[in-house]
Amino acid sequence: MGCGEVYFPPKMFCNNEGRESRMEDVFFGESLGEIYTASVNRHPTTKFEYLEAPFSMYVSFRADGGRVMVSGRLTDFRASLDEIGIGGFIGEGVVPRFRRVYDDGLIHYSRLSFSLLDDYYETHLARDLEPVVPGGTPSERPGIVGYGAYVPKYRIRVEEVAEASGKNPDLYRGVVKEKALPFLDEDTRTFAVEAAERAMFHAGADKNTVDVVSVGTESNPYAVYPVAVSVAEACGIPSSVNSYDARFACKAATSQFGLMIGAIQAGIYRNTLVIGSDNSQARPGDALDYSVGAGAAALLLGGEGVIATLDGVAHYSSDTPDFYRREGERYPSHGGRFTGEQAYFRTVVSAGKSLLERTGLSSGDFDYFVAHQPNMKFPRSAARALGFEKDQYELGNAVDYIGNMYAGSCIAGLCAILDVAKPSERIMMVAYGSGAGSDAYVFTVTDEIEGKRERAITLSGQIFNPRREYVSYQFYRRAKDQ
């Protein structure tokens, strides 16, 4: 047979099959699919034992007038093997999710995991809206262009944690009511991708205009290997982006706001994506075990299509080791009662007062107040200490139902406010990070927010979603410690 001749004749079922066939990259990560066929792996291989009984399937996607089949598995799904009827899933719509696949020292991620379209997760892919909205109005002051928060589907009530630890549940009901936890294939990276995608869709921004991806976290699955690079690539942001992780406990993300706004104002960057993401850690039975949550929140900052301008900044820092984790230790340590008055309250209130002094404003000049939320009591007490009333601070307190999201906590509270805030309303935000420091900001809502209202996936819609699922303490610890 001579060079260039066809060795395998084309097969009838595919015009591109055979020696002369070709392959091309096709990305379905931002497309809805349908379950074509499925099976339950009752005895998974070692790599997938953590999922117990993976639900494998072929997902059908429309492409060029035909269909393409992609193999994957169903995620965020827990059911007894005896309860699963495969036939009921055929034809169901599914959404690609960026999740962990397996861990062999290197954690492997992909979008070959799918959640059911009508499950807990609302997706912008199901909305009849263009992903990019051109021609955002330039703003005199840079600020927030879009926002997005991600809270996992699974929850545990604080009573469940107390009973598992042999404690009286009544003693802990003032910490949080319930809290979010990851599924077995979720972590800080997957949370960050979800929040980033929501923020960019809400903004209607072209991914090619995102010049920075910054992720604040204290629960990166790796000691060395930044979360931000995974977010940028998974979200389709060009490789020319400046990607990096930031660290300062729970204010790791908010500490970037002023720096990013300054760079945007100077013309160095166009849009910057700042994300706070954490699978908050706590030693089993420790006081933190009652409050730690999971999830992420993201802001796209820029100078066009701004929904809230940044109009004031103040900071406060001191060498206060109220909360820390030594290198090589799995769980953080804390100073117990020392974390309150001497750390959180002194720092948050000082930063808040400094902001009011620098801007010449008073608590009565604000419509909303949000602070870092380690538990239900602290942010409310700090708000009152700064002169705020309940109708100003209550909306931003999401901790009651999702727990302390660490680096995502304060931003998630801000997202809850932006979900309902009206043009000209003013927001004061005071973040906190153990060690210790606070970032205080003034945001003023603009008319642009109304045009993006239908693009938001609201925080309350996730917190109170009727499809959220409650789990046992054993499942909670397993998901936390994966």
Model-derived features: positions:
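Short nucleic-acid-contacting surface segments enriched for D/E, G, S/T with interspersed K/R
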Residues: D76-R97
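Claisen-condensing/thiolase-fold acyl-transfer catalytic domains that form or cleave C-C bonds
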Residues: L129, V193, S219-N220, P238-S240, ...
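OB-fold/S1-family single-stranded nucleic acid-binding modules
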Residues: R97-D128
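Condensing-enzyme catalytic core mediating Claisen C-C bond formation in acyl metabolism
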Residues: R127-E186, D286-Q342, R346, G435, ...
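Extended interfacial segments that mediate partner engagement and assembly in macromolecular machines
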Residues: S21-D82
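Short, charged beta-turn/beta-strand-edge "cap" motif at the junction between a beta-strand
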Residues: N41-R42, V94-G105, G433-G435
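Cys/His-rich short segments
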Residues: M1-L32, Q482
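Phosphate/pyrophosphate-binding loops at sites that engage ATP/ADP/AMP, CoA/4′-phosphopantetheine
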Residues: A195-D211, V349-D365, L386, A421
